[in-house]
From Swiss-Prot:
Annotated family: Belongs to the methyltransferase superfamily.
Gene3D superfamilies attached to this UniProt entry: PUA domain, RNA methyltransferase domain (HRMD) like, Vaccinia Virus protein VP39
EC number(s) reported in the record: 2.1.1.-
Natural source organism: Deinococcus radiodurans (strain ATCC 13939 / DSM 20539 / JCM 16871 / CCUG 27074 / LMG 4051 / NBRC 15346 / NCIMB 9279 / VKM B-1422 / R1)
Enzymatic class: transferase
Pfam families: Methyltrans_SAM, PUA_3
Descriptive protein name: Ribosomal RNA large subunit methyltransferase DR_0049
Biological function: Specifically methylates the cytosine at position 2499 (m5C2499) of 23S rRNA.
GO BP term, pick one: rRNA processing
Length: 408
């Protein structure tokens, strides 16, 4: 996986007319099937130049010969040199956007857990960086970033020298990482004692399993929806289904819920939720945990009298590929139907989806179909999308959606 010799000609690509149009419209991906000409074989992470049919400069991107997503666009417009200053300016632009939301990178305020780099939408395609207090978690989704890893570490070390950096890898590149002596969960800069980090979100303390947890250790993308739930929880009995480590549960408790139930099939997740409550002893709400399959548990309790005033349905992705889309849409409807059976009159249903293959319109219609079948009157409180640190700059990056409904 070495870089090509310096004497090798620049890697040049020509792409289909449709791909040209997509690039000009700001889309950051070029698929293998769209490459029409290539002057030579390329190595992972090479900077390849894309030309249009008239031999005019179109883009520069990261090349990955092992992925059907062959090129991830870094720059379009006029030709430029992607030197150290270019990379530094791009990172600083992303950090400035976060500073407007959370303060400087090295500040420790009410929220020191957030997304620092959101892949393509921040101009770093195939790379995300999340911050948890004094730890940065860098997750790679393409082998094209391996040759640039040292550069990224140097850039962050110059801006946050006391932070540790943990490397996380998508499954598809783990084997190639091993060839380079890298592995998922590896501390590649600084020091980290243990596998977990305690960070703050809106003043609440949470534990993130940064070396082996889901995503980068916590579901940071639901922060704004957690805040919304907090504002709706006073005096309510709250059910947090697919609770994972209890994010919604803690916000509901701080919002004045009378009791909160965290429901998840994973005993490990429920233990994590209990640890997070222990980190926040000021929360007075009764917290219960239930280990069960949500799809089975919700309808099984119909008519039991164990009703809730606020039900949160936040499952993991139900469609990881396009072939699973129709089944996921049906599953979202089934979940909403089950949640409604446990929702008391006047209660609030919060349904969320993180499946990129299911559009916001398809998801909301699945939920609303279940609502209409229930025969209950309803009022839509709001629909929500991405948090500002998880902004999406192109259609495929839009995955998160939620709908808040109040039922009679």
């Amino acid at each position: 996986m070495s870089a090509p010799a310096s004497s090798a000609p620049r890697l040049r690509l020509r792409v289909s007319k449709a791909a040209e149009l997509h690039i000009r419209d700001g889309h950051p991906w070029v698929y293998e099937s769209s490459v029409r000409e290539q002057n030579r074989e390329g190595e992972p992470g090479e900077l390849a130049v894309v030309y249009d049919r008239r031999d005019r400069f179109l883009a520069i991107g990261l090349y990955d010969p092992f992925s059907p997503l062959r090129l991830r666009v870094l720059h379009t417009g006029m030709p430029t040199q992607l030197d150290d200053a270019w990379w530094a300016a791009r990172l600083d632009a992303a950090l400035a956007r976060r500073a407007a939301l959370f303060g400087p990178l090295t500040a420790f305020g009410d929220t020191d857990g957030y997304r620092v780099l959101n892949g393509e939408s921040d101009g770093f395609p195939g790379l995300v960086v999340d911050r948890y207090a004094g730890v940065l978690v860098m997750k790679l989704y393409t082998a094209a970033w391996f040759p640039h890893l040292r550069r990224m570490l140097e850039l962050f070390a110059a801006r946050a020298p006391d932070f540790a950096v943990v490397l996380r890898l998508s499954r598809n590149i783990a084997e190639r990482a091993a060839d380079l002596g890298l592995h998922d969960g590896q501390v590649i800069y600084g020091e980290l004692a243990g596998d977990s980090v305690v960070f703050r979100e809106s003043g609440l303390r949470f534990e993130a399993e940064v070396r082996q947890g889901q995503k980068t250790g916590f579901f940071l993308d639901q922060r704004e929806n957690r805040r919304r739930v907090e504002g709706l929880s006073e005096g309510r009995r709250v059910l947090n289904a697919f609770s994972f480590s209890g994010g919604f549960s803690l916000y509901a408790a701080r919002g004045g819920a009378s009791e909160v139930t965290s429901l998840d099939i994973s005993a490990h997740a429920l233990r994590s939720a209990e640890r997070n409550f222990a980190l926040n002893p000021e929360l007075s709400a009764v917290h219960k945990t239930v280990q069960a399959d949500v799809f089975e548990w919700l309808p099984a309790g119909k008519g039991s009298g164990a009703d809730y005033d606020l039900v949160i349905l936040d499952p993991p992705s139900l469609a990881r590929r396009e072939a699973e889309r129709e089944g996921a849409i049906r599953a979202y409807g089934k979940l909403a139907e089950g949640g409604l059976t446990r929702l008391a009159p006047g209660g609030i249903l919060v349904s969320a989806s993180c499946s990129a293959h299911v559009s916001a319109e398809e998801f909301e219609e699945a939920v609303m179909s279940a609502v209409r079948r229930s025969g209950r009157r309803w009022r839509k409180l709001l629909s929500s999308r991405h948090a500002p640190d998880h902004h999406a700059s192109f259609a495929e990056a839009e995955y998160l959606k939620a709908v808040f409904l109040q039922m009679d």
